[in-house]
Amino acid sequence: MRSCLSIVLAAGEGTRMKSSLPKVLHKIAGLPLVCHVIKQIELAGASQLAVVVGAGAQDVTHVVQSFIKSVMIFEQKERLGTAHAVLSARLALQKEVDDVLIVFGDTPLIKQDSLLKVREQLAVGADVVVAGFYASDPTGYGRLLEKNGKLIAIVEEKDASDEEKKISFCNGGILALNGKRALSLLEKVNNYNSKQEYYLTDIVSIASREGLEVQVVEVPFDNIVGINNCFELFEADSLWQKRKARDLMLSGVTILKPETVYFSYDTEIEQGVVIEPNVYFGLGVKVQSGAVIHAFSYLEGAVVGIDAQIGPYAHLRPGTELARSVKIGNFCEVKKAKIGEASKINHLSYIGDAEIGAQTNIGAGTITCNYDGFHKYKIVIGDHAFIGSNSALVSPLMIGNGSYIASGSVITEDVPINSMAFGRARQVTKKDYAAKLRVRLSGNQQKK
């Protein structure tokens, strides 16, 4: 297997984002742009990874090192162009590798297939390989100049002639170099251009003049699209969501209106699941086969068991684990709770820091009072228990198997197995008193 050093350029300021957050840390599907790129690079077989940081260097470094442990970080102190940025990783380039793969950290839709296609050309003898795409409107992109079927140069639009601007074959931003020639080619790049910057793209013309083998590989535009502003971020996120929905549907997931469903990068959904419109999947969600996620539900950090029913209008928060055939109904919020098989929380409830057994029913309006302003406390409810409507369960608390809690109760003490607990004031009924009350109240109103 060929060894590969991949260098990710993540030093740009991203001024057009109009944000204090470094551009590469903006997120698509809950994952920073640069991490999307790193993920695909790993899948494409890179054995070494270097990331060049600049604007927001400390924040970018922290995110990257949290995402992947084995990474070299280099800082570009001055913004002198893309070739200068790559040379900031000189120490990595001095190591002996077969391939050097250079990509931009703001291209989150990049796919391993495109990266592998570029690397394949190095494997068969190319010294320089560029990814290119055909654009219906090439405005803003560098143009690929060919002669006799050979790529001879890349010219940036600001430096292109009127004739060159008519070319629709554009630079896709992925560059691969023969590892033995990479450093020497980079050191030959000069800054003789309108911006006096060291362009990475000049490597193509340098290699061509030296008679080296230069190749171009066509890749789909949606694989290499870059992010420069918040609208482009939205467009890229929308495309990512379409890809995810398509992959899920082809794997056997039914999504009734996919354009209204939002997935995170790590969402796992098994075949046979049905997802109704307007559902949000935050980070860390796994949905097992046969489950139904009804409309307007919000899930994050939750595991949904086989054949479970969620919603509509349900909120599953981090730490939620639902066993087989659990039902979480309308306007219910569940947080950091394990719910046993076939248990039901059907209406208007908050269940937090709890463990509930199998085939237990939680009545409408029940809440767990798990926080005293300083600490969170846990409640444990056994199997086959029945919690009546409008009950307040004050943690810490244990309710035994088969126990029954009367509606409207405030329960503050443990309830043994197969017991019944009342925790409410006794009802007082005054017969025929309503008519007297109306007379008294109407008299008070007339005096005013």
UniProtKB/Swiss-Prot annotation:
The gene is glmU. Pathway: Nucleotide-sugar biosynthesis; UDP-N-acetyl-alpha-D-glucosamine biosynthesis; N-acetyl-alpha-D-glucosamine 1-phosphate from alpha-D-glucosamine 6-phosphate (route II): step 2/2; Nucleotide-sugar biosynthesis; UDP-N-acetyl-alpha-D-glucosamine biosynthesis; UDP-N-acetyl-alpha-D-glucosamine from N-acetyl-alpha-D-glucosamine 1-phosphate: step 1/1; Bacterial outer membrane biogenesis; LPS lipid A biosynthesis. It comes from Bartonella quintana (strain Toulouse). This is Bifunctional protein GlmU. Its EC number is 2.7.7.23, 2.3.1.157. GO terms for molecular function: glucosamine-1-phosphate N-acetyltransferase activity; magnesium ion binding; UDP-N-acetylglucosamine diphosphorylase activity. In the N-terminal section; belongs to the N-acetylglucosamine-1-phosphate uridyltransferase family. Its cofactor is Mg(2+). PANTHER family: BIFUNCTIONAL PROTEIN GLMU, NUCLEOTIDYL TRANSFERASE. Homotrimer. It catalyses: alpha-D-glucosamine 1-phosphate + acetyl-CoA = N-acetyl-alpha-D-glucosamine 1-phosphate + CoA + H(+); N-acetyl-alpha-D-glucosamine 1-phosphate + UTP + H(+) = UDP-N-acetyl-alpha-D-glucosamine + diphosphate. One of its GO terms (cellular component) is cytoplasm. The active site is at residue 347. The keyword Transmembrane does not apply. Residues 1-230 are annotated as: Pyrophosphorylase. Acetyl-CoA binds at residues 364, 370-371, 389, 407, 424. UDP-N-acetyl-alpha-D-glucosamine binds at residues 9-12, 23, 76, 81-82, 142, 156, 171, 228, 317, 335, 350, 361. Residues 231-251 are annotated as: Linker. It is found in: Cytoplasm. Keywords: Acyltransferase, Cell shape, Cell wall biogenesis/degradation, Cytoplasm, Magnesium, Metal-binding, Multifunctional enzyme, Nucleotidyltransferase, Peptidoglycan synthesis, Repeat, Transferase. Catalyzes the last two sequential reactions in the de novo biosynthetic pathway for UDP-N-acetylglucosamine (UDP-GlcNAc). The C-terminal domain catalyzes the transfer of acetyl group from acetyl coenzyme A to glucosamine-1-phosphate (GlcN-1-P) to produce N-acetylglucosamine-1-phosphate (GlcNAc-1-P), which is converted into UDP-GlcNAc by the transfer of uridine 5-monophosphate (from uridine 5-triphosphate), a reaction catalyzed by the N-terminal domain. Mg(2+) binds at residues 106, 228. It holds the Pfam family Hexapep. InterPro entries: Bifunctional_GlmU, GlmU-like, GlmU_C_LbH, Hexapep, Hexapep_transf_CS, MobA-like_NTP_Trfase, Nucleotide-diphossugar_trans, Trimer_LpxA-like_sf. Binds 1 Mg(2+) ion per subunit. GO terms for biological process: cell morphogenesis; cell wall organization; lipid A biosynthetic process; peptidoglycan biosynthetic process; regulation of cell shape; UDP-N-acetylglucosamine biosynthetic process.
